[in-house]
Amino acid sequence: MAVEGSRDERRFTFVSGRVRYSVDTRSIMYFESELRRINLVTTEQKYVFYGSIGEMEKRMKVDYGGFIRPHESYLVNPDHVSRCTAHEMILTNGKSIHISATRRADVKRYYSELINC
């Protein structure tokens, strides 16, 4: 897995099955972990591959920046958050993601500058 390219044209590459994929990081809405599988949801489709949400968090913060982890199972691209309350994020596709109590302060601090949570 890697993130490649300039900031405006970054691509996240990964392998699912025996196929190598490359997606524009701007289209990534969120990563969701289920056991050792990662569901990568973009504006156009969903991909599944093996990995951990912790690995995704490190990779996206180092290589791309800006992704936030509101819950132990999710890593979210803030560009796709339409609104945020103390307990949940609503994404541009209507998906609601719970903000865990242990991560609430970090999320609030992060979003207070962007969208006034």
Mark where each language-model region is.
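Conserved binding/recognition cores within well-folded domains
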Residues: 2-92
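Short, structured coil/loop segments at alpha-helix boundaries
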Residues: 63-65, 99-100, 104
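Short, solvent-exposed loop/turn segments at secondary-structure junctions
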Residues: 75, 104-105
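C-terminal structural segments of small proteins and small subunits
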Residues: 87-91, 95-98, 105
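Short, surface-exposed, low-complexity cationic segments
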Residues: 108-110
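Charged phosphate-binding loop/patch that engages nucleotide di/tri-phosphates or the phosphate backbone
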Residues: 115-117
